Amino acid sequence: MTTNTVSRKVAWLRVVTLAVAAFIFNTTEFVPVGLLSDIAQSFHMQTAQVGIMLTIYAWVVALMSLPFMLMTSQVERRKLLICLFVVFIASHVLSFLSWSFTVLVISRIGVAFAHAIFWSITASLAIRMAPAGKRAQALSLIATGTALAMVLGLPLGRIVGQYFGWRMTFFAIGIGALVTLLCLIKLLPLLPSEHSGSLKSLPLLFRRPALMSIYLLTVVVVTAHYTAYSYIEPFVQNIAGFSANFATALLLLLGGAGIIGSVIFGKLGNQYASALVSTAIALLLVCLALLLPAANSEIHLGVLSIFWGIAMMIIGLGMQVKVLALAPDATDVAMALFSGIFNIGIGAGALVGNQVSLHWSMSMIGYVGAVPAFAALIWSIIIFRRWPVTLEEQTQ
């Protein structure tokens, strides 16, 4: 076995470790979607009231991503990952012990703090540790961790919550994070901060219209997605009239389809990212517009969820690739902004879905989400024609 072979295997193992970490972080972000009813019952609240926790979490991440990234810009990355995992684990212990909804929200804010730092550095670390010529595949592997959070983490968290209580779901995530932390300590080398940028990077980034256009596209399309996705569980049960088990299966199917999207992007993203993203946004638009009509059939909803999951994974990967390509001199700052903007979209979508459900009808969340999806489609066509260069090649 050659040294080069060993090095490539070690490199992939490190990327896999980051992908597992991504799975852990995204599981805890997504899992409340499947636990809203149980948490609401525990604290004698309405489901829509508990749902505001999703917006609080997302907007804390959005608000703190850039400040935390700047504060830690010179910190060695292995040490930083260890510290943020400690905060992450401690916050989940507090979630397990929560004696009131306020305490639960406080614990989730602690998780959001760790999240804010994690996603501002993970994509650039994955690219940095990937074998030569395999950077797009490394990003796809990280995205696969995200998809597995939906296909395995969210349904398993929901099942644990149903049988053992929602507190045990958060405790189990904390245990998983502890195991992941031990793996990080064992496998990761010292990772001095590189190309992290600083506050001085912001004016330079803001003067890049292509990058700003990608940020705007991101917040609009994520808002569209989360307007419907945040309340997909009660939609399936209360509007479509299907069972709780089918709701779990639908979440499983949507997440699994995300893995398909990750594979597609890994194979075609190097050459066709712009076309893939615009096509995926169009697919998302169709899925949202057909959500209510599809609610009359389990098969229709199942097929729709497959295309929905594929679309969102391609969109997420495409946005990351373009951000990294447009800011190679300040990747951490650019990704901190991306993480913050992405979470603005999550919070906005969850809030819109909340308000539609409370003051109009939950049956309308798909139609309402389709409005920003249509705007995102038009914007993507405009900006990809304005900047037609195959940006993703710059990250190779």
Swiss-Prot record:
Ranges per topology, Periplasmic: 36-49, 102, 157-169, 230-245, 296-298, 354-363
Keyword Transferase: no
Pfam families tied to this protein: MFS_1
Xref: Gene3D superfamilies: MFS general substrate transporter like domains
Membrane topology listed for this record: Multi-pass membrane protein
Superkingdom of origin organism: Bacteria
Gene Ontology CC annotations of this record: plasma membrane
UniProt-listed InterPro entries: MFS, MFS_dom, MFS_Efflux_Transporters, MFS_trans_sf, Sugar_effux_transptr_put
Parts of the chain that traverse the membrane: 15-35, 50-70, 81-101, 103-123, 136-156, 170-190, 209-229, 246-266, 275-295, 299-319, 333-353, 364-384
A single GO molecular function term of this UniProt record: carbohydrate transmembrane transporter activity
Places the protein is found: Cell inner membrane
PROSITE patterns: MFS
Keywords from the UniProt entry: Cell inner membrane, Cell membrane, Membrane, Sugar transport, Transmembrane, Transmembrane helix, Transport
Family to which this protein belongs: Belongs to the major facilitator superfamily. SotB (TC 2.A.1.2) family.
Described function: Involved in the efflux of sugars. The physiological role may be the reduction of the intracellular concentration of toxic sugars or sugar metabolites.
Family matches, as PANTHER family: PURINE EFFLUX PUMP PBUE, SUGAR EFFLUX TRANSPORTER
UniProt cross-references to HAMAP family, sorted A to Z: MFS_SotB
Protein name, as recorded: Probable sugar efflux transporter
Native species: Shigella flexneri
